[in-house]
Structures are given as structure tokens and as C-alpha cells.
Amino acid sequence: MVGIDLNTVEEEEDEEEGGATGTVTAPAEARAGGAVCLELWHACAGPVAPLPRKGSAVVYLPQGHLEHLGAAPGSGPGAAVPPHVFCRVVDVSLHADAATDEVYAQVSLVADNEEVERRMREGEDGAACDGEGEDAVKRPARIPHMFCKTLTASDTSTHGGFSVPRRAAEDCFPPLDYSLQRPFQELVAKDLHGTEWRFRHIYRGQPRRHLLTTGWSGFINKKKLVSGDAVLFLRGEDGELRLGVRRAAQLKNASPFPALHNQISNTSSLSEVAHAVAVKSIFHIYYNPRLSQSEFIIPYWKFMRSFSQPFSVGMRFKLRYESEDASERRRTGIIIGSREADPMWHGSKWKCLVVKWDDDVECRRPNGVSPWEIELSGSVSGSHLSTPHSKRLKSCFPQVNPDIVLPNGSVSSDFAESARFHKVLQGQELLGLKTRDGTVNTASQATEARNFQYTDERSCSINMSNNILGVPRLGVKTPSGNPGFSYHCSGFGESQRFQEVLQGQEVFRPYRGGTLSDACIRGSGFRQPDGNHAPGAAFKWLAPQGCDHHGITTSVLPQASSPSSVLMFPQTSSKMPGLEYIYGCLDRNENSRHFKIGPTQDMTRTDQTLRLWPHLISGKVLDECTRNEKLHSPVSGAEHESNNKCLNTNGCKIFGISLTEKAQAGDEVDCGNASYHSRLQSLKPQMPKSLGSSCATVHEQRPVVGRVVDISAVNTMI
């Protein structure tokens, strides 16, 4: 084991080293080569291994010392030792373990709280009083003639040698005589213990390269080096070659300290520290710079300066660290908060800053740092504190029209979406909702509105390609004269299995509850011919402003056995209510829109097959161009009695095409909207050929035009 007294380095820098070889054990022998050994020790310790100087003022943090020893949080003397102990450095000596070549330092300290308190009262700066500054505690300047290489599998094999980069060989090794056919030379290098190692340096191969051959395998076996460890060579000012190692296993796995360090550095030693602090006697701290990610012996000036900086959430910082290839690098991050790392050490500033690293994947450091470890590099706005992430699908509330008001003062919207559309892309989340007083509500009321849904999901909706939806049960009123409704044509034929939609392609399911759909969607409408209503009618269609039509009623909402199968109506004795659908036809020579109305004939469900256009099922109307529906307010009692006299069961027409053999011509209604001139002409339905009188096959992914729904087995309808 080698002991190097750091305090005598400056006095003996110019002394030449003796030619002794072998392992050096006496401190005097170590001091003889102090300057070179100091460089080698720092080279093996890594680029971030600061050490205090003799006589300097430091702050000792026992909490960090416990973490350095691997003790569990909450262990140690606790209240017996203050979280920050102001000390004076009595001595610093450097050591290297004989078995592993691992470097560590022994720092002797004495508590000096009174002197520090006096300085703080007088407002003196620690660096000025000690004659110290940043340069005084820095590690020695970068050694110009040094290289470090991580060993590969071929470097550690017994058959080959150690391949040296050409630039490194020319910088560190003595020059070769390239006039020879095979240039070579003998190299002698000393390790931390003063042991000499001899290697044959040759320049050969195709292409030619520098190799260490003879003697290299013996060095690998003796030091027990493996692939991943690092070997470094440096040449001092006197031209002598030095050799050191850095073990990757100790850096990655935090292997135990060397033997001397293990004998003294344990949890019980903190009890001795507590006693030494109380009586102001000297105590010793053993410090391994490669195993400690954070310093727990801090220069006084550095400790005090860290508290003069205004740390705040959102500030960016840089932190120096040693990479696996033994080079110095900087890691960056953002401050996101503050905390006490261990409640037992109340008031401790050890790792009190909570940070977020920019390289979360590669970073193995904890999310807490100490103020004196980092260098501030700027600040960011609060909107950048969140983690950047790629666009991904997320569950979403339906995006609603903010101008539709529910009876309870909340909001509603026009919906025509299948229940299977559950996801949208990021940025398509729920918008604000507008109430009667103009205020905007958000997700809470949208959730309330979504609760107005059918109990049986199967009977209410299928995929939007089929556009078959159940009838709502609770009236929702559309404000008259509202110009905020806009409808856009959309084609049919989307697959029922399409589970996701892109931005701008969302359609939404209806709220559960409400009366039948709006009979007029900006230019189309429905009309109920004169006749008697069925008794006990519970639903009717009301005309919105600008449309002239009557309502129709039914007594009980029929149920569908399955969205993709023939609709079955279990009632046995009721007759079909009078029903008319107004098919819109545009006159190309006029800015008007005409609708043909066809009354239905009396018929029972047991002897008629009802061929329905897919957009009109069980009293529900969907706009062909928009696939949207409008909802109405509940029917008042007076309107209910008045419209109960208008039921007629003569027949049914859809888009001007009779659904029965006894279809009759109807009236014409003008709703005045020519915006869908070409669209509605192209969408004029064509009835398919008869598929028989029993049932019709429904293909879910085919276009819905001309779909036949067989209800010949229907007994009744209320």
C-alpha cells in the first residue's frame, strides 16, 4: 500500500525521483516521488475528484458520509451530530489499495464552529480569509501526456497484445526508430505502488499499428483485469512513464472499499465523529472519489456561495461527472422542487433540490442534488417543465357543441357516433361547454351529459358506417334561431372495426334520454299526415324554426335484438303509426328545396315486410348528408293532447320511394336551403331488388344504401 502526503507536494515538486523499483511502503519513499504520484493518483481517481488542502475551512456533512458508506436512511448518530459541521483540514494523505489499485484519501478534520460563526457574523468570505479560491482546490491541471483506453476482449486475451492508438503512442511513449524494418523498443512503467512493469513496444501489422506484446499478458493476469476496465499511461515532466488502472466493476457495482478503508469506515465510526465534534478533537474521514457520486466534504467558500445563488423551479443546470471511458462530461437538467432527503437530518441541505435529468434513459443518478454540485445555466418557462412525449392516442370525452343547452342548465350536443369510437389523437380533447348564461364549463358537465345514455349499448348504436342508433328518451331543446349548427356531408362505408379516428373526423354518440331527433336538419323535414294518434303516445317530432311539419308519436319504444341483424318488435297487437318521410329534391333552376311526402297504409306487423332506409328506424331520423341528429325538448301536455288526434296509419315513404305496395303521394314542403343541391341529387336512394319475404342479410362493411330490414316476424308495435 502506498501513502502519499499531499501536504508536502509543493515543497518537493522539483526533486527528482530515485531509481528504486518494487513496491513502496514507507511514507518517506512515497514523498520522494510525490509530484508524479499525485498526478497518477488524480488520473486514477478520475476527472472529478476534488480534495481540500491543509488548513482550509470545509463543511462536513455526516448525512452524505452515511450514504457514501451505504448505510440505510435514518441510521447513524442522528441528533448527536449536526447536519453541517464546520471544520478545519488538519491533514490529507492519498492511498491506493495493494490488491485492487483502488485509490482513496484520508482527510483529518477538527471541528471549528466558533471560527466559522465569527466569520459569518462579520460577513467575511471564506475564500478571501483562507487565501483560497476556485483555483486553490482544483485538481492539478490536465496532464498533457496521458491517454486512457478501455480494454477490449482482444486486449485481455493471452494470445494478442495491447493495441495503442497511434496518436497516444507518439505522445506518451518514447519515439521509435522508424528506419528499422520492424521498429520496436522496451518500455518501463511504474504503477501507484512503485512497481516497475516492462513491455515490448512494437510497430507492425497490416495496416501497421502500435502494440504492447511481451509482458502485457503477465500484467493483465497479475492485476486481474477484464474487458471493460481501463488502463492509463502518463509521462511526467521528467520523462518517466507511469501506469494506472480504473476498474469498471467498482464504478458500476459499487464494490467494497479497500481493506484499510473497510476497517475504519463503518457506521460506528460516526459515533466517534460525534464525540470528536463535541470535544473538538481530530477525527479521520476516508473518502473514495470514484464511489461517491456527491461530495460530503465541501470547501467552505463553495458551500456558502451555493446559498447566495437564487435557486428556483424551472432553472436549468449543469453537473460534471465521470463517464465510463474515464472522461469528464456534463449532464444537464431542470430544477423541479426542493425537499429534505432524510427527515432525521432536519435542516440539512444534502440533496435538497429535486431535479429532472434531460437524459432520463441513460442517467443512473438519483433525482436529488445538492446546491453546491451544480452550475446554473439559465431558466425555462413553466410550460416546458413537463416531459416531452410523442403524440399518442388517449381516451377522450366527446367534443360537444357549446351552444346546445340541456334542461338542467348544462349542455348537450348533436351526436351521431357509434359507441365504439373511444379514442382520438392528442389535441382533440374536450372543449369548453357553454351554459345559458354564457359561462364555459368543462369535463365535469360533459361527464354528466354522457350519463344520459341507454342502458343497452347493443340496441342504441352500431358502427357509424351503418348509422343505426337508438332513440333518445329525454327531450333536449335546440335554441330557435341558433346559427351555430353546421353540417357536413360524409360518405358511408367505413369499416365497423375502425376503432380510432383522426383529428377533425370525430362523431359522437347521442346523450341517453331525450325525445326523437329533430325532424328538420337545415333543409330536410318530416310531416305527420292528419289522423288519430295512438293512445298513450309518449314521443312526437316537433318542427324546428323554419320547417313546416307535424309530429308523430309512438306508445312504446321498440327494441332491436341486434344492430347487425333483423330488427324484431315483440309487441303483438298494435298497428304501425302513421309515418311520412320527406325526401328532399332540388330543382336546379330554382333556389328552393322540395320534399315529397308519402302517407302510410294501415298494416300490421304480422303480414307486412317493412323495407326501411337505414337512417329511419323506430322513429329516429338521421340526415343523409351529415349523419348527425338534433334533439328536442320534452313535449308539453297541451301539445301531447293536440297531436294525439293526428295519427294516420296509411303507409310509409322514405326519400320519395314507397315502402309498401299501397304508397300514396304526399304534400310538398319547402324549407328553403340550396346548399346541398348537388349532394342530395347524388344521394337519391335506389331500392334494391326484393330479397324475399322472410329476412335480409346485412353486411356490416358494405355501403348502407338500399339495406333491407325484415320485420315480417314482428307481432306488434306500440
Curated annotation (Swiss-Prot):
Q: Which Gene3D superfamilies match?
A: 2.30.30.1040, DNA-binding pseudobarrel domain
Task: Point to the regions of Acidic residues compositional bias.
Answer: 8-18
DNA-binding region coordinates = 147-249
Task: Fetch the SMART domains from UniProt.
Answer: B3
Q: Which SUPFAM superfamilies does the record cross-reference, listed alphabetically?
A: DNA-binding pseudobarrel domain
Entry's Gene Ontology BP terms: auxin-activated signaling pathway; regulation of DNA-templated transcription
A cellular component term, taken from the record's GO annotations: nucleus
Superkingdom field: Eukaryota
- A single GO molecular function, which one? DNA binding
Induction and repression of expression? By auxin under dark condition.
Cellular compartment(s): Nucleus
Question: Where do the segments described as Disordered lie?
Answer: 1-24
Q: Does the keyword Zinc-finger apply?
A: no
- InterPro entries to which the protein is assigned, alphabetical: ARF_dom, ARF_plant, B3_DNA-bd, DNA-bd_pseudobarrel_sf
Statement: the UniProt record of this protein carries the keyword DNA-binding:
yes
Family, similarity comment: Belongs to the ARF family.
Q: How does it assemble?
A: Homo and heterodimers.
Function description: Auxin response factors (ARFs) are transcriptional factors that bind specifically to the DNA sequence 5'-TGTCTC-3' found in the auxin-responsive promoter elements (AuxREs).
Matching PANTHER family: AUXIN RESPONSE FACTOR 2 (PTHR31384:SF182), AUXIN RESPONSE FACTOR 4-RELATED (PTHR31384)
Q: What is the official name of this protein in its record? A: Auxin response factor 2
